[in-house]
Regions:
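N-terminal leader/targeting and accessory segments in enzymes
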Residues: 1-94, 282, 352-355, 380-381, ...
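Acidic, Mg2+-coordinating active-site environments of NTP-dependent enzymes
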Residues: 12-16, 71-79, 185-331, 355, ...
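Active-site beta-alpha connecting loops in nucleotide-dependent enzymes
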Residues: 51-52, 317, 335, 339-408
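Short acidic-hydrophobic, aromatic-tinged amphipathic segments that line or gate anion-handling sites
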Residues: 83-87, 412-422
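ATP-dependent carboxylate/acyl-activation modules
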Residues: 110, 318-320, 443-451
Length: 456
């Protein structure tokens, strides 16, 4: 890893090196926090968690061939190199910031209330048509996950597409300091993490912290149909590029046609050029993700042919609108996370399903003092949708179920108090030929519901 010598690591994280002097100039081969991934030449960063203190794994990591380890305490009688630091978490962020600077490659930072992951996937797919692109994997988008993503970069990578997720003020500033993006993309401002951020104005303030470490002559790409983002006129003399359905946006879409659960077709207008794309994922919200990707592709010099190819070769990922066909059902696996905006969008897509259309929904978390009202609003939306069965699970989802039934007395609404009860009764609620949407916040562990359906 470029310039990641033990000497540089100790210096950038303010640590004290203990060990043989002849090891100081050796470069680490990888940086890990999971002791099970120990390999020859790695640097181990033991994180102190709520349940596990990873310092206890230091001996086995060193035995597996690690070059060195960080440690928040002095290790008496250690016969291996280590760097004593005040905080392993802060150290790993400092090291990641240093390492990314050494590589000197463009960085696209992506945030927003809804659609971060899908937008990241499309942008990476587009950029990969011209550049060797590294993207965030899974949910590695927080103060630990972002550094670990950065450490996956190697000399052959030409651009990084980094997802940045937050739940409180100040977090984005810390993430942006590591990433220092050339291009900042904000998908939208919704009702997420209101427990800490208060309201949508708070969400806007927290998300736009990403601009604080925007590199000079950088770019800002924003959703021009979002009433909060449209108020961002410029930052440090950098004027945003807006995308949306309005022809007042620099990048806009029209002639949007649904192909059911197979995807969408739309025309993208990019400057004086217009071209049609087939989006291989359903939902009008996907059009916005694609427009953001087109804007970013244009910034980095891709042709319209390359942008189109990147969009049309997109592959869905687990838990994010992935279609699973079994012998009995079509499962719409959207269970990774949920908030009111994404929940409504998923219900809209479900209406295009064949057979009985069943929504299996669970509680949404971190919504603050308006959590009951926001669940009721989703219930009202469900009641107005052309679906056949609504199954609500969780304490807060009782409010969703009740509002849905009041909105549409003809809708079959089922309430289960918890996931265990749902799993016990689920087989009796579904039948061959159903299209089944599964969606809830991550803490509800609805991937177990998807697995149950797959195995029926």
């Amino acid at each position: 890893m470029k310039n990641l010598t033990l000497e540089n690591i100790a210096r950038v994280c303010g640590g004290t090196y203990y060990g043989p002097a002849d090891k100081l100039q050796e470069e680490v081969m990888s940086v890990i926090t999971d002791s099970r991934k120990a390999e020859e030449g790695c640097l181990f960063v033991p994180i102190v968690g709520e349940r596990v203190d990873a310092h206890k794994f230091i001996p086995q990591v060193m035995e597996a061939g690690a070059l060195a380890t960080l440690s928040e305490r002095v290790l008496d009688n250690a016969d291996f190199p280590y760097i004593a630091v005040e905080s392993s978490l802060q150290a790993v962020k400092d090291i990641a910031e240093f390492y990314l600077k050494q590589l000197q490659i463009p960085v696209v930072g992506i945030t927003g209330s809804v659609g971060k992951t899908s937008t990241k996937e499309v942008i990476a797919s587009v950029l990969n048509q011209k550049y060797h692109t590294l993207k965030t994997q899974g949910n590695f988008n927080n103060e630990l996950g972002l550094p670990l993503t950065v450490f996956r970069l190697r000399d052959g990578d030409e651009i990084a597409v980094l997802e940045m997720g937050i739940s409180d003020f100040g977090e984005m500033t810390r993430l942006a300091q590591i990433a220092r993006p050339d291009t900042c993309v904000i998908t939208n401002i919704g009702t997420c993490h209101l427990e800490n951020l208060g309201d949508r104005n708070g969400v806007l303030k927290a998300k736009t912290e990403i601009f604080k470490f925007l590199r000079p002559e950088g770019h800002i790409v924003l959703n021009g149909d979002d009433d909060k983002l449209i108020t961002v006129k410029e930052y440090e003399k950098i004027k945003p590029v807006f995308f949306g359905m309005s022809n007042e946006c620099q990048v806009y879409g029209d002639k949007v046609v649904s192909r059911g659960l197979k995807g969408m077709t739309c025309t993208i207008h990019l400057g004086d050029t217009a071209f049609t794309v087939d989006i291989p994922m359903p939902g009008r919200h996907m059009v916005y993700n694609v427009l953001a990707a087109a804007a970013v592709g244009n910034i980095y010099g891709l042709t319209t042919e390359q942008i189109k190819a990147g969009i049309e070769s997109l592959e869905p990922i687990s838990g994010r609108f992935r279609m699973i066909e079994t012998d009995k059902f079509l499962i719409v696996d959207d269970c990774y996370n949920a908030n009111p905006m994404s929940m409504k969008a998923s219900l809209d897509v479900l209406q295009d399903g064949a057979g009985r259309r069943i929504a299996v929904l669970g509680d949404m978390g971190e919504l603050g003092e308006n959590e009951v009202q926001l669940h009721e609003e989703v219930g009202e939306h469900a009641g107005k949708c052309d679906i056949d069965v609504l199954i609500c699970t969780g304490k807060l989802c009782r409010n969703m179920a009740e509002r849905a039934q009041r909105t549409n007395p003809n809708l079959k609404v089922i309430y289960e108090p918890d996931r265990e009860s749902l799993l016990e009764h689920l087989e009796g609620y579904v039948q061959d030929g159903d299209t089944i949407l599964v969606k809830a916040s991550h803490f509800m562990k609805f991937e177990e519901v998807v697995t149950k359906l797959e195995n029926m």
